[in-house]
Amino acid sequence: MGKKNPNARHTDAATPLTTDDSNSSSVSRRESATESKSASESESSPPRSNTKQSRTHKNVKASGKATVSSSSDSDQAVANSSANDEEKEPVCKIRIVPLEKLLASPKTKERPSRGSQQKNVTINDSSDEEPLKGSKLVLPARKSRNKNASIIELSDSEEVDEEEESLLVAIPLPKEAQQTKPEKNSSKASKESIEKRQKAQKEATTSSARAIRSVNGTRRGSLSSERSSRASSSRAESPPRPKRCVVRLKRVSLPKTKPAQKPKKMSSDSEEAATTSKKSRQRRSKSESEADSDYEAPAAEEEEEEERKSSGDEEEAANSSDSEVMPQRKRRRKKSESDKGSSDFEPEEKQKKKGRKRIKKTSSGESDGDGDDDKQKNKRKHIRKIIKTKDLDLTTKEAAKEEDDRRKRIEDRQKLYNRIFVKSESVEINELVLDFDEESKKALLQVDKGLLKKLKPHQVAGVKFMWDACFETLKESQEKPGSGCILAHCMGLGKTLQVVTLSHTLLVNTRRTGVDRVLIISPLSTVNNWAREFTSWMKFANRNDIEVYDISRYKDKPTRIFKLNEWFNEGGVCILGYDMYRILANEKAKGLRKKQREQLMQALVDPGPDLVVCDEGHLLKNEKTSISKAVTRMRTKRRIVLTGTPLQNNLREYYCMIQFVKPNLLGTYKEYMNRFVNPITNGQYTDSTERDLRLMKHRSHILHKLLEGCIQRRDYSVLAPYLPPKHEYVVYTTLSELQQKLYGYYMTTHREQSGGDVVGKGARLFQDFQDLRRIWTHPMNLRVNSDNVIAKRLLSNDDSDMEGFICDETDEDEAASNSSDSCETFKSDASMSGLAASSGKVKKRKTRNGNAGGGDSDSDLEMLGGLGGGSSVQKDDPSEWWKPFVEERELNNVHHSPKLLILLRLLQQCEAIGDKLLVFSQSLQSLDVIEHFLSLVDSNTKNYEFEGDVGDFKGCWTSGKDYFRLDGSCSVEQREAMCKQFNNITNLRARLFLISTRAGGLGINLVAANRVVIFDVSWNPSHDTQSIFRVYRFGQIKPCYIYRLIAMGTMEQKVYERQVAKQATAKRVIDEQQISRHYNQTDLMELYSYELKPSTEREMPILPKDRLFAEILTEHEKLIFKYHEHDSLLEQEEHENLTEEERKSAWAEYEAEKTRTVQASQYMSYDRNAFGNQVMGQFGNASGSVTSNKIFGFRSDILLQLLNMKISKDHQELNQNQVIQLVPTYLQQLYNEMNNGDPTMYKDLLNLHSNIVHPSGMYMNPLLYANQNPNAAGYNQGTGGVPPMAGGSVAHGPPAAPAPGFEPDKVYEID
């Protein structure tokens, strides 16, 4: 076959290829094309590059013998039958084969090579022949094109359109042409005819090239005529031959189709047939669409194909047709985000659905999406390459550059500030300058010295940090909108005072700073605390003319709007709750006039405040919540976020909060995931490689450095110099026999009967945890739950009764309406006869999701069963599965719960020494049970008749006097009143506070207590950490003791070990709503495993530093299996464990310590009778047990109090804050004097000690004599001491006899 000139361009008009009976008819139609049309096409078509043409030819040549004839055996059979059967009608068929299939290795056996005479062969044997060049598929003009028809035309032009795609088309010719097919040993005449035909084709090619270069219409017409005549003569002389061509298809978008109307309801058989037919049509259309458009397979698909072949599926793949292969590839390609090959052939409706699917697919930066399989949860992933800095979004680079420039300016300014104002020899901070003149070196803005005296060093640094981050300088604040920061100081470090100081400085100097309005947004429980803190700290400032607006005091919206408008016009500080701000800042709020809405938008949004402070800012961690959206709409960029919850490992919270205070600093979410989250997360798996670990550390360091300019962290180690020590004990309690029986039945039988399934049931996990918690608390908890289920059934259809229910997290409007009598509902009138439900009364309480009943605050998954029609309980009630195992009289037996026994014993010991106790629980039902048994103890003390057994526990427990309860049902005013009454150190009767962890774990100050019981484990360990800081904060003067009670061998122990023991709670924030997605099948099976009876024997415990806890360990050996001291606020260090002999020796020393007489020079007891009368010269015996560490014979908390008194006496001009700062200095002086043998200060402390009337925690609580036997404390008196009279008054008790041989004026050697 003659080769054509690649540069030549044919100008013949292309006509449609039809199925006529001869090839000559097709040729004649092509010759009859108008010359003018061909001339215009040749003239208008510009020269094109031959790159794609050459690439196409190269691909075809590279295919070798893998041509169209090897596509499938079925096509060869059709072609052979068409060539050999002379009697059949002529046929012209087009076979379209994807290019990757042609380039692949042939699936049939290779045929033996043939001679040179086999060049002209049939279509079935033409695999060795080079394909015909120059054929092009041309589409008619758009005007003449039928939109609903698919037209294919054949052209001899070699031009390549950039938008078109090439396919090889095999065309079997009619029988007239195939009858002239040359065979082996052909005659000489046939060879001559072939040579003539080739010569004619060569001449036609030459004439075509001349026609393309011609610009004259006449010459072009003559050349076209000459070419046509020569081509006709050559075709007449040469016989027709089989022919192959390259067809190029162009994508044509289909017209929009109207959605089909909903068909009528059909029978099941017809519906199934219609569905099958529809699916087959969809598969067929997908196959055709894929074959017409997508001819290049991705590399991943080629690899999958090769793997499939190598695994033994080669024969199946060879016999499969295109329609069987393409739909599978179509489904895979749907998931590809970058591939859009078949989008033009899809209807618009399908394209939209396809787009919605792609949204769910994680992008390049979200490879660790939550939708992965459980198998991939704990395994490393192949993350994408980290985006380079130059490829980041423009806003990201601009924000990073702006932050870098700001930090450089602050560093330079700080160096100059240190040279001017900071004196290295100065110990106390005399002034805090926020801005100064660089030339004159004069202070332009400084903090009021009255407030400065109240600040600790870390608070001074915090105020300076907030100013630098938000304002930088006075000049910058006037020219730029400013930015924000996060003050991530630990709980109890005085973030409120820092904000008060900064706000006062800005508002007093409003002409310089330009700040008139400061907005404080906080949780509902801390709104009043903020107003109180502003009022109390302003007293120490020289200027206190700042107006503070507490909007929560006003209950109606018109008054709130009026006060907000007044604040906006007059200036000052406004305090709002998060929910109230969300309601008032809502543009679409109902019930407001247009003018009122405009006033609210002006005051709160645009222009809004000049500075906004968001307390407990971790509530803004989700940018999709309505509160986050409302706060983000504020125009001001000067935003301060306060949070005491550590953020080191919660990367998503990082992004949401940083995006709020420093927009675009971390880039888009996709960039943030790619640059930080994926590498850091990928290095935390057990199978992470060394490279993953290095990359994780590297990216963590970069993230820390990037954010240190806008986040300031201070942990609780800052408190250590100012607060007494803290000890935290994790106590593992055993289960009673009844609890073990209930637990075993639930795990083996009841769960299966109720449809329990471990695999993938996160909701079921929560429900089981709630039911099991009721078991290990006390069987009475099961009764409380059953009564609550009955209450829900009775009140499910009564909407009127729902108005009396109280929500655990209520809005301000609801809290205001329920503030009068809501808190009184938690104490039932039926305390004598058990719980209220047992006597027909129902406690009305609303759970977090609005359901009725006294359920748990975080338990929304209880099985309610069917609704009951009356008050009688259905026999098949699933909540009463426990009744066959528990008798009614056993419900009031306190010995069925080791946890309750330990709690009551702690209360008894604390009552004896005057310590106050807090009890935190996640469950409102657990608090109900504790209240119930306190009422039984009260009845036992007052000799009332009751059914039950509370042992030897006695005491008066009256709600509102002896103990308080704080949960979501209490209004803000009631919370404040209860906390104030409890914190009164002279009120020794108020000694217990029951608190719901979710409702009272934030924002309250209860430093009057120094002991905390965490009654149950929380899924979120940060809640327990918040509970600890209710007592361990500034203002605490006693050593703090924390007791975590955990049921041994149960799911509670598994949860604690997973969430707390293996991860420091200060560095972990877990979203409890995502727990079901964080547990795979193996994790769930581990949680459901239990060992109620330990396989090992109880070891001798280490002697605790808390002597009160040592008493309980000695008395209740069978209830406490083991314990360990664990500081949840610090990284744990490996310590050497004591041997068994060393532990026994320590306990023997402790027992001997309890029974011997102790000299006052060594120890001072908390018992009042251990201290004599100074007038009589009797310092008395220090008999009794020791409850704390001693320093020179004093308890550490007593010594701190005495040092405070001495400093106040020596320096009467100092305030309390300055006195506390001098305590370490006086303590060091005491050590030095005692080491040198000088007892001057020691004697002064002894004199102060003897003059104290009621030191905190020093004497026996006088209520002990009024309520119960004084010997109930369990302390043995020394030989020289006189025991107090039963029922006698403490103030008039008999003096203790002096210790033998003890002379007060003599200096004794200190142990």
UniProtKB/Swiss-Prot annotation:
One of its GO terms (molecular function) is ATP hydrolysis activity. ATP binds at residues 489-496. Residues 241-265, 352-361 have a biased composition (Basic residues). It comes from the Eukaryota. Residues 1-384, 837-878, 1285-1311 are annotated as: Disordered. Residues 61-83, 219-237 have a biased composition (Low complexity). Residues 905-1085 form the Helicase C-terminal domain. A motif (DEGH box) lies at residues 615-618. It catalyses: ATP + H2O = ADP + phosphate + H(+). Residues 114-125 have a biased composition (Polar residues). Disruption phenotype: Deregulates heterochromatin silencing. Keywords: ATP-binding, Chromosome, DNA damage, DNA repair, DNA-binding, Helicase, Hydrolase, Nucleotide-binding, Nucleus, Phosphoprotein. One of its GO terms (cellular component) is germinal vesicle. Residues 28-40, 181-202, 336-351 have a biased composition (Basic and acidic residues). Residues 476-664 form the Helicase ATP-binding domain. SMART domains: DEXDc, HELICc. Residues 155-166, 290-306 have a biased composition (Acidic residues). Belongs to the SNF2/RAD54 helicase family. This is Transcriptional regulator ATRX homolog. The lineage of its organism: Eukaryota, Metazoa, Ecdysozoa, Arthropoda, Hexapoda.
